[in-house]
Amino acid sequence: MVKPIPDHLHTVTPRLAVPGADAIDFYARAFGAEQIRDVFSGPDGELIHVEIRIGDSVVMLTGESDMARAPGGGPVTAIMATYWEDVDAAWERAVAAGAEVIYPLEDQFYGERGGRLRDPFGHQWMLSKVIEEVSL
């Protein structure tokens, strides 16, 4: 019987538009990503689909196209929220790989240590770790 949701995916799985399959290398260096599916390319070599795993989560990548554009001049439409056992090490690795700091990694009033980065493809990533339980 065919499963409507593949075992390795969840009800919501992010799919990021990137310039090409070379993005896999950045995500491997920045976040320890592993490629878990072969690259599916179109007739002209453009990236159609690939899947990577970061920690326990799958992220799909697709090539940039007119169908995968944010509204001109509008705010970002999504931010990747990630949690790490060692957020400081994850942060340093991502910055060393070329991620741009949007706001620095620091202890937050809501009980997390976190900050926000932008990858070379324009996607924003929050890196966090819960450091204390706080009632909000």
Question: Where is each model-derived feature located?
Answer:
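Vicinal oxygen chelate
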Residues: M1-A17, I24-P120, L127-L136
